[in-house]
């Protein structure tokens, strides 16, 4: 599956410091990526049935900041992202709207590509749909079965026999990604695609690895597994192991993926590659974006779509600036005021870098680098740019190179394009 075009990332003098990031599993700041060489990043992708709302954009912009900071520190970045282009919510939406699920997925992925391109998000090197990785995922399920780390469940209520599940008790580290208690995990499992009440499971938390074919559902041949399709969590695990190896430097996604998705994915990986654990050196989770006091979600329908904002005349750089003005781990609310503030800030910054000269900007570059290296503190970086812009407005300045350095700093590190 193709991704999208690579935005221009201006060159900057010098190099940034090593990045430290909040790790969900330990609850503290940890250095991420090597001091030299290649950093690896896996970010869970969309289920394509309502393309990019601001909650999505917040996540992919957040981890784009990480990739930019890594590259600025002199690292190569291997970045993989999936698309969950066959899953129950997608199939349900397709049936409800009378659209073929494949056409729905492709149309929404195309919108997503356009949104990411507009927001100047650097694309992953490998952008993979689950449909094109079914053989890979099925192989992982067969490997788990062969290792005694998977089991089949008989059908219920007239359903077919043979669904394959993963026994969470097989991984001694299960529960360490999110640190939730059993009651919370059971509630989140039921809320987020699990089936804790299914008869025949050894543990209510055990996740589905392979769903055998049901009438009217897409299915693929998978040898001893029979015709069927993958469960959600094993998809990302199999793709990440194939294209990044283990351990990954950072496994990332929205905070609603901590459990069950990332917890289960790590457990799968630990059983598939027991000598290479942990699955990831750090787990990073972005905050949720709300509208009218409620988290944006497809199920609630309270979505602000990036494509609609841009179609309404809002520059994509303004949308990105609104996002990076909020710390990547915080929950925040999209409002007209947030948009107005971002628009006004973008205008001030654009005017300042259009001037023939300004105050020296080397210290600003250093500050932006320091802020991003400290848990991707983009709001701190934005505040530093604001301070330089205000100084430029009140004192003018005589450094003819400064405006261009500020423009390149903002573009390269924050991903905000200034005209």
Curated annotation (Swiss-Prot):
Pfam families: tRNA-synt_1e. Coiled coil: none annotated. The keyword Transcription regulation does not apply. Its cofactor is Zn(2+). It is an enzyme of class 6 (ligase). One of its GO terms (molecular function) is zinc ion binding. One of its GO terms (biological process) is cysteinyl-tRNA aminoacylation. Keywords: ATP-binding, Ligase, Metal-binding, Nucleotide-binding, Zinc. A motif ('HIGH' region) lies at residues 46-56. Binds 1 zinc ion per subunit. Zn(2+) binds at residues 44, 236, 261. It catalyses: 1D-myo-inositol 2-amino-2-deoxy-alpha-D-glucopyranoside + L-cysteine + ATP = 1D-myo-inositol 2-(L-cysteinylamino)-2-deoxy-alpha-D-glucopyranoside + AMP + diphosphate + H(+). The keyword Protein biosynthesis does not apply. A motif ('KMSKS' region) lies at residues 295-299. Monomer. Catalyzes the ATP-dependent condensation of GlcN-Ins and L-cysteine to form L-Cys-GlcN-Ins. HAMAP family: MshC. This is L-cysteine:1D-myo-inositol 2-amino-2-deoxy-alpha-D-glucopyranoside ligase. It comes from Kineococcus radiotolerans (strain ATCC BAA-149 / DSM 14245 / SRS30216).
């Amino acid at each position: 599956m193709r991704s999208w075009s690579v935005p221009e990332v201006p060159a900057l003098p010098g190099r940034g410091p090593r990045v430290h990031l909040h790790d969900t599993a330990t609850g503290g700041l940890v250095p991420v990526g090597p001091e030299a060489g290649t950093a690896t990043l896996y970010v869970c992708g969309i289920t394509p049935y309502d393309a990019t709302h601001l909650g999505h954009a917040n996540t992919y912009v957040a981890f784009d900041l990480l990739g930019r900071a890594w590259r600025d520190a002199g690292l190569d970045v291997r970045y993989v992202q999936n698309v969950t282009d066959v899953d129950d919510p997608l199939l349900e939406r397709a049936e409800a709207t009378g659209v073929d699920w494949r056409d729905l997925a492709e149309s929404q992925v195309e919108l997503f590509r356009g949104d990411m391109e507009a927001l100047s998000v650097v694309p992953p090197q490998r952008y993979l749909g689950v449909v094109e990785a079914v053989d890979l995922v099925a192989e992982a399920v067969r490997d788990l079965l062969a290792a005694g780390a998977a089991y089949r469940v008989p059908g219920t209520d007239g359903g077919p026999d043979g669904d394959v599940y993963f026994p969470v008790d097989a991984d001694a580290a299960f529960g360490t990604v999110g640190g939730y208690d059993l009651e919370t995990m059971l509630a989140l499992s039921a809320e987020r695609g699990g089936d804790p009440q299914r008869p025949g499971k050894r543990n209510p938390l055990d996740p589905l690895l392979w769903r055998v074919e049901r009438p009217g559902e897409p299915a693929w041949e998978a040898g001893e597994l029979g015709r069927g399709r993958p469960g959600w969590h094993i998809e990302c695990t199999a793709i990440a192991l194939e294209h990044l190896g283990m351990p990954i430097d950072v496994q990332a996604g929205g905070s609603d993926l901590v459990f069950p998705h990332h917890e289960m994915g790590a457990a799968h990986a630990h059983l598939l590659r027991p000598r290479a654990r942990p699955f990831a050196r750090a787990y990073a989770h972005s905050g949720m974006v709300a509208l009218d006091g409620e988290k944006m979600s497809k199920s609630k329908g309270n979505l602000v779509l990036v494509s609609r904002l841009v179609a309404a005349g809002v520059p994509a750089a303004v949308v990105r600036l609104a996002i990076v003005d909020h710390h990547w781990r915080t929950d925040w609310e999209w409002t007209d005021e947030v948009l107005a503030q971002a628009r006004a800030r973008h205008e001030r910054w654009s005017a300042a870098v259009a001037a023939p000269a300004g105050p020296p900007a080397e210290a600003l570059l250093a500050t932006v680098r320091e802020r991003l290296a400290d848990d991707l503190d983009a709001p701190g970086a934005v505040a530093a740019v604001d301070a330089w812009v205000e100084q430029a407005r009140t004192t003018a300045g005589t450094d003819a190179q400064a405006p261009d350095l500020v423009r390149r700093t903002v573009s390269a590190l924050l991903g905000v394009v200034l005209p």
